[in-house]
Regions:
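Structural signature of eukaryotic scaffold interfaces centered on beta-propeller domains
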Residues: 27-41, 152-167
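Small/polar beta-strand repeat architecture
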Residues: 61-166, 175-179, 198-200
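N-terminal beta-propeller domains
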Residues: 1-66, 178-201
Length: 201
């Protein structure tokens, strides 16, 4: 019995390639389905289907929305981020980078809570407040990026009954309990899921 090895047709075997941790899925407590989306050899994505949503991956990373400038982070429990007109909603997942001073938050993912127009609190994936009282004081700079996702009609229980077919930038998705859906990519962070309107003829 061989484990973590690749057997070649001519008889030899070699150690299998390694894997890379890219990101935690949206909901680690429930099943998630990964479906490939390949437009060309240079434009390939991985689609993460979870309960009522899809997230997107490319080039070993999550697809993120545009930069939101951070102008302050409190040393408090919970940590409160100031970012003018950020546009986030409670429960959004964001990645923070490029902060000077409070570097403990850099490169990490947080859930957004306690949203106001210009501020939001940081919690971890379990919804526990991020206590930044022991962090280095915020100095300057920093950006946040929301993890890009779209909503779907597919529940966790339905994910593995999905059938799909792709043509160029369009994927057709079927499930016995739902209308046929068309997933379209028009830009890196512009994906839409719409009902297919069949015409008699």
């Amino acid at each position: 019995t061989l484990e973590n090895l690749v057997v070649y047709p001519h008889g030899a075997a070699a150690r299998r390639p390694g894997s890379t941790f890219v990101a935690e899925v949206a909901d680690s407590d429930n099943k998630t389905r990964l479906i490939p989306f390949e437009f060309s050899t240079t434009q390939t994505y991985m689609l993460e289907f979870s309960n009522l949503k899809i997230r997107f991956y490319k080039d070993n990373g999550s697809i993120l929305e545009g930069d939101k400038t951070i102008t302050g982070i409190t040393q408090a429990n919970p940590a409160v981020v100031t970012s003018t007109s950020h546009g986030y909603s409670n429960g959004d997942e964001v990645v923070i980078t490029a902060v000077v001073g409070m570097t403990q938050v850099n490169g990490k993912r947080f859930l957004v809570a306690g949203v106001t127009t210009n501020t939001f609190q940081l919690t971890d994936k379990d919804g526990t407040n991020v206590n930044s009282t022991g962090y280095t004081a915020y100095g300057s700079a920093g950006i946040s990026n929301k993890v890009y996702e779209i909503t779907t009609p597919y529940t966790t229980a339905q994910l593995f009954d999905i059938k799909f077919a792709q043509s160029a930038d369009v994927m057709y998705i079927t499930h016995p309990s739902h209308e046929v859906e068309k997933l379209s990519r028009t830009a890196h962070t512009t994906w839409t899921l719409t009902d297919v309107d069949f015409t008699n003829g």
